[in-house]
C-alpha cells in the first residue's frame, strides 16, 4: 500500500511487518489510514505524539483457554479472546463472536472498526471485540451453557460496566448472553449492566434485536433523500438471513421498498412479490433451517445454489448483511450493470476494497459499515444508559433515539467528507468524523 504521507506509510509498514499474517486487520487499517491523509497532514502534532502508532495498536489483548465437557463426557478445549482496543472516549464496547473462523486478525479488525463506529454514535464508548473458536451450531443447550460458563470464568476479571461491556455477535445470541450474564453474576455477586443484548426481564433493551437492521435502513433513507430518492417502490436485495438481514427486510418494506432476494451460506432465494420477513424469521429463528425452506411457504419463489449469485439479481438498492468480504469486485460489477444505484453495508466490512473503489468510481451511493450498521452498538449504548439509570424505555422511545442517532451519523459523515473536499465520499467522511473525536481525546489524555 502506498500512502502519500510518509508518516502514515511508516506506521503502516511497521504494522504490516509485525503482523504479516493478519490480512483482515491490515485491510481495515489501510482503509482508515487512507482516509486520514488530509487530517494527518493538517495536524503535524499527531506524529510528535505518536498518535497513529497508538491508534492502531490495541491497549490490551487477552487470550485464554476455555476447557469444557461435552455431553459425551469428553473434555474439549477452545481458545478465547478479548481485544480491548481503545478506551479514550469510554469503556471498551464490542461484541463476542463464537465461530470456528475466529482468530486474532478478525477480532483486531472488528475491534479497530468498532472504535470509529462507537465514536460516530456520539455515545461514550471505546472499542473492543472478543470471542472464541467455538461453534455453537449442533451443540446442545447444556453444552453451550457449560462453554459459556467456562468462558466467563476467565473473562469476568477483565470486564465490568465501567471497564469493558461485551455484547453478542455471530454465534452469540440471547441464549449465550443469558448464560454469560448468569455466570458473571454468580462469580461477582453483583447485578450490573456488564453485557448488552440481554433478555428483557433482566436488563435488556427493547428494540435491541431490531436495531442494526432498522438503523441500516434509517441511514440509507437519509442517504437516498440527499440524492432525491427514497425506498418507495424500489427493488431491494439483502444478502444474509440473520438478525440484521431480517429486520432490514422489515424496515425496508415499511419504508415502501420491495425486498426481492435474500441468502444464506448455501444459496439465495428470489421472490418477485417481496420476501415476507415473518416467514424468514420463522425459518431462521424458530426452525433454524436453511433458506431453501422458504419454498415450502412460498412455492412461487426461486432458489439458487451458491450465495455469490445474489449480486446478479437486478435491483435498485443492495444491502450486504451477511459477512466480511462477501461483495467482491465481480459482485459490484454485476450490481452496476443491472442498474443498482445504492449500496449500504449492514455486515462488518462486507465489501472488498476493489468493490468499494468500483462502486464509488461509477457514482453509486455507498454507505460504509462503520456508519450504516452502527445502529446495533448505538442501542447497546442506550441499554447501558438504561441499566445505569435503573429504568426501561419503551420500544418507541428507543426506536426514536436510534433513528435520531442514525440521522446524525449520516449528516456528520456527509458534512465531514465535504469539509475535506471529498463530497459524497461517506467512507472517508465516516472514518474522519469517528477519528477526530478519538484523536482529540487521546491528545488530551497524554501518552498513555
Please place each PLM-identified region on the residue numbering.
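Adenosine-phosphate binding glycine-rich loop
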Residues: 2-28, 223-224, 336-448
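N-terminal ligand-binding/catalytic initiation module
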Residues: 1-206, 437-446
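Glycine-rich phosphate/diphosphate-binding loop of Rossmann-like nucleotide-binding domains
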Residues: 196-199, 204-312
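Rossmann-like adenosine-cofactor binding region
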Residues: 267-366, 371
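Active-site nucleophile and cofactor-binding loops and adjacent substrate-binding regions
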Residues: 73, 169-170, 205-212, 237-241, ...
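Glycine-rich beta-alpha junction loops
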Residues: 84, 129-132, 171-172, 176, ...
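Predominant activation on well-ordered alpha-helical scaffold segments within soluble catalytic domains
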Residues: 12-13, 30, 104, 108-112, ...
Amino acid at each position: 500500500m502506498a500512502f502519500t504521507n510518509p508518516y502514515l506509510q511508516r506506521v503502516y509498514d511497521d504494522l504490516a511487518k509485525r503482523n504479516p499474517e493478519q490480512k483482515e486487520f491490515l485491510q481495515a487499517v489501510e482503509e482508515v489510514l487512507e482516509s486520514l491523509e488530509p487530517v494527518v497532514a493538517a495536524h503535524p502534532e499527531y506524529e510528535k505524539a505518536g498518535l497513529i502508532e497508538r491508534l492502531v495498536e490495541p491497549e490490551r489483548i487477552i487470550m485464554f483457554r476455555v476447557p469444557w465437557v461435552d455431553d459425551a463426557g469428553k473434555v474439549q478445549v477452545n481458545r478465547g479472546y478479548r481485544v480491548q482496543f481503545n478506551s479514550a472516549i469510554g469503556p471498551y464496547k464490542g461484541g463476542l463472536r463464537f465461530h470456528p473462523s475466529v482468530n486474532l486478525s478478525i477480532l483486531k479488525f472488528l475491534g479497530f472498526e468498532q472504535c470509529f463506529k462507537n465514536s460516530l454514535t456520539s455515545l461514550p464508548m471505546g472499542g473492543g471485540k472478543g470471542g472464541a473458536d467455538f461453534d455453537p451450531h449442533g451443540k446442545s443447550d447444556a453444552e453451550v451453557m457449560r462453554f459459556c460458563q467456562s468462558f466467563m470464568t476467565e473473562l469476568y476479571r477483565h470486564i465490568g460496566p465501567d471497564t469493558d461491556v461485551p455484547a453478542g455477535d455471530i454465534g452469540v445470541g440471547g441464549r449465550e448472553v443469558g448464560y454469560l450474564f448468569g455466570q458473571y453474576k454468580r462469580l461477582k455477586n453483583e447485578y450490573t449492566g456488564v453485557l448488552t443484548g440481554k433478555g428483557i426481564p433482566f436488563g435488556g433493551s427493547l428494540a435491541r434485536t431490531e436495531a442494526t437492521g432498522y438503523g441500516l435502513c434509517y441511514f440509507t433513507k437519509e442517504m437516498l433523500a440527499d440524492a432525491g430518492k427514497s425506498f418507495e417502490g424500489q427493488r431491494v436485495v439483502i444478502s444474509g438471513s440473520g438478525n440484521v438481514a431480517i429486520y432490514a427486510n422489515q424496515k425496508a418494506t415499511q419504508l415502501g421498498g420491495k425486498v426481492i432476494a435474500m441468502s444464506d451460506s448455501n444459496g439465495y432465494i428470489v421472490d418477485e412479490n417481496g420476501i415476507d420477513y415473518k416467514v424468514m424469521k420463522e425459518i431462521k429463528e424458530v426452525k433454524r433451517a436453511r433458506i431453501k425452506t422458504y419454498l415450502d411457504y412460498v412455492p412461487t419463489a426461486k432458489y439458487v445454489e451458491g450465495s455469490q449469485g445474489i449480486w446478479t439479481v437486478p435491483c435498485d438498492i443492495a444491502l450486504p448483511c451477511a459477512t466480511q468480504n462477501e461483495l467482491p469486485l465481480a459482485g459490484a460489477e454485476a450490481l452496476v450493470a443491472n442498474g443498482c444505484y445504492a449500496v449500504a453495508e449492514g455486515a462488518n466490512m462486507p465489501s472488498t476494497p476493489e468493490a468499494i473503489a468500483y462502486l464509488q468510481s461509477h457514482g453509486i451511493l455507498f454507505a460504509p459499515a462503520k456508519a450504516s450498521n452502527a445502529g446495533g452498538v448505538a442501542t447497546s449504548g442506550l441499554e447501558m444508559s438504561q441499566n445505569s439509570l435503573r429504568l426501561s424505555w419503551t420500544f418507541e422511545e428507543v426506536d426514536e433515539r436510534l433513528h435520531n442517532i442514525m440521522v446524525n451519523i449520516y449528516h456528520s459523515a456527509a458534512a465531514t467528507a465535504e469539509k475535506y473536499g471529498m463530497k459524497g465520499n461517506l467512507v472517508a467522511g465516516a472514518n474522519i468524523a469517528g477519528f477526530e473525536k478519538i484523536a482529540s481525546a487521546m491528545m488530551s489524555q497524554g501518552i498513555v
